[in-house]
Amino acid sequence: LNVDHRVAYQASVTASRPVPNETVKKILCFEILSSTEWSDKNKQVFSPNYFIDISKFIEKKLKALKIYDKEIKNSPNARSLKSIKNLASIRGSSIGTHYAEAFFVERICE
């Protein structure tokens, strides 16, 4: 939805093209509440296929996000700490853990 995010994504993927001895091994796209779910439905919709258990770090994540006081909103906004924690809980239940971060694999080179 955000044009600057799309441009940054395209620049990152372009700059990360596989080349001998300098290949970026993994490119993961992450979910941004109040942006990802409003993307152009004619384009690829965020469909996570890579999850990381963040149960040990959820409170640290929330504490770190508080620094971004211009981005974090009050509940029930999608970018409230409550909503962020709730989404992490839902993503965690998808993989059988308390909290998880969900990603879409753009590319993995092994």
Each PLM stretch: what is its role?
Residues 1-110:
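Metal-dependent de-N-acetylase/amidase catalytic core
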